[in-house]
Regions:
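Residue position within the beta-strands of beta-propeller blades
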Residues: 40-44, 103-105, 142-146, 218-224, ...
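Beta-strand-rich domains and repeat architectures in extracellular enzymes and scaffolds
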Residues: 15-53, 91, 209
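Asp-box/WD-like beta-propeller blade repeats and closely related beta-sheet repeat scaffolds
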Residues: 70-184, 195-201
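Conserved blade-ending motifs and adjacent loop-strand segments that build the rim/top face
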Residues: 250-257, 313-331, 381-407
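A short helix->beta-strand "capping" segment at the edge of beta-propeller domains
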Residues: 2-27, 386-390
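Loop/turn-rich, solvent-exposed surfaces of beta-rich toroidal or solenoidal domains
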Residues: 276-295, 318-385
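Short, conserved, GDST-rich strand-edge loop motifs in beta-rich repeat architectures
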Residues: 46, 87-89, 145-180, 221-233, ...
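Blade-level signature of beta-propeller repeat domains, shared across WD40, Kelch, NHL, RCC1
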Residues: 401-440
Length: 440
């Protein structure tokens, strides 16, 4: 029996005239794509033949190109078949949504552009390094560009890659371990472009970084596609003030919420970490070892230390129903509500079987989620209230087709990517709970 619920309508945000001829996507979820007043949205589009960053004024219906890329896609994490040292680093683009400045890598240059398209070169990427998703501090003063020894992606995508994205056949993190490859947290002054410091993280492949929202001396970073111990190695903190780095998630059976009896284990899969606005908590999700998917919260108290001299941490995790096994991402609004592009299953609905050539990473879940949902957590009770808002119907084929939903700053809308046919486009849906339509 189909017991489908009412849904809201999705609205096309990207250019409707060219929706079938070019791709348009949000910036990566570790930063917002929206101005503080939610009037302008910053997008990556290849409408002129090459990926560039565009500002779309949603109230006036105008567009402005902010970058000047004419060399395709730079090779980096998730864009494995890009060109070495040439092109736009699609993974590098991040927005200072308060001052409306974008930061990005063009060829080997670290650049900044304002909303009027005034471009300034801040610095350069050192030779022999590979870059990934960058991040700007909330106060707008610092830019962190994660880099790794170039050997990490030293391969020919055409002969040594596989899948739609041509990722290498070798285990990337294992190469970092075996060959002693390092990552570097490179932090720059956003005005002068000066390198403020560079922290070496040994035997590590960093692809995601996020400044603490209230303390730019603290950076959260990841170990991407961990070859071992993903349950504890994935999420990490570097405290520049104390010059220490450490894993955030620990093993243990003291988890609050509702883990359905699963203890935290190094053999779990953990992913997509993000700060809450106050910097007191880190949200993440993943799956228990031979168990269900889960979403978690780590409260981290930087004012008190444990027996190891590290900040006191407490964990809440909520195990999902067994049938909620569709890969997705959890993002948060400014009020603590989550949104998700996967996991949820509409009761009674037949699951669409998808042939996902990118479904070959370390995660244990299927890439066949079809809904944008609003998820209201009660961490202490260990419950999640799922509200399906609309279908995104993306095919999940490649990073750019991952919906990666984000809230408007006002919390009233959710924006997401979707490829329903041949191209990726950006849509929005109301975050209000859908209402039944009653006949009178």
């Amino acid at each position: 029996m189909n017991t489908s619920k009412p849904l809201n309508g999705r609205v096309l945000i990207s250019d409707g005239l060219g929706r079938d001829s070019f791709n348009t996507q949000l910036l990566y979820f570790t930063c917002s794509s929206l101005s503080a007043d939610d009037e302008r949205i910053y997008l990556i589009s290849d409408r002129d033949g090459h990926p560039n960053v565009w500002m779309h004024d949603m109230f006036r219906g105008t567009d402005r190109k902010l970058t000047d890329n004419q060399k395709g896609i730079l090779k980096s994490y998730v864009y494995f078949d890009g060109t070495q040292d040439e092109g736009l680093g699609k993974a590098s683009v991040c927005l200072d949504y308060i001052r409306e400045r974008i930061y990005y890598i063009q060829d080997d240059k670290i650049c900044r552009s304002d909303r009027d398209g005034n471009i300034r070169v801040l610095n350069r990427v050192p030779d022999g390094r590979m870059t990934a998703f960058a991040h700007v501090s909330l106060d707008g003063t610092k830019l962190c560009v994660p880099m790794t020894d170039g050997r990490i992606l030293d391969f020919d995508p055409d002969t040594e890659g596989y899948g739609l994205d041509k990722r290498p056949k070798y285990n990337i993190d294992q190469r970092a371990q075996d060959e002693g490859l390092n990552s570097y947290l490179c932090v720059y002054d956003t005005e002068s472009g000066a390198l403020l410091y560079e922290k070496t993280i040994p035997r590590c492949w960093i692809t995601h970084v996020q400044f603490h929202p209230l303390d730019s001396d603290i950076i959260m970073y990841n170990h991407e596609w961990s070859a071992f111990d993903c349950g504890i190695r994935r999420v990490n903190i570097y405290d520049h003030r104390q010059d220490i780095f450490y894993h955030v998630r620990t093993e243990g059976d003291d988890t609050k919420g509702n883990s359905r009896g699963y203890a935290r284990s190094r053999n779990d899969w953990v992913c997509h970490e993000m700060w809450t606005d106050d910097g007191r908590s880190i949200i993440y999700h993943g799956g228990y070892d031979h168990g269900p998917a889960m979403v978690g919260r780590c409260d981290i108290d930087f004012t008190h230390t444990d027996a190891d001299g590290l900040p006191v941490r407490n964990f809440w995790e909520i195990a999902l129903p067994d049938e909620y096994n569709a890969y997705g991402h959890f993002l948060m609004d400014h009020r603590g509500n989550l949104t998700c592009d996967g996991y949820y299953r509409m009761p009674g609905e037949k699951i669409i079987e998808r042939e996902n050539s990118t479904d070959n990473g370390p995660d244990p879940h299927r890439k066949d989620g079809a809904y944008i949902t609003k998820v209201e957590p009660d961490w202490d009770e260990g419950t999640l209230h799922w509200v399906p808002l609309c279908k995104h119907d993306s095919d999940w084929l490649g990073q750019d087709a991952h919906p990666h939903p984000i809230y408007a700053h006002a919390g009233d809308r959710i924006f997401f990517n979707s490829r329903m046919a041949h191209t990726v486009n950006v849509y929005a849906v109301s975050a209000r709970t859908p209402q039944e339509v009653r006949e009178v």
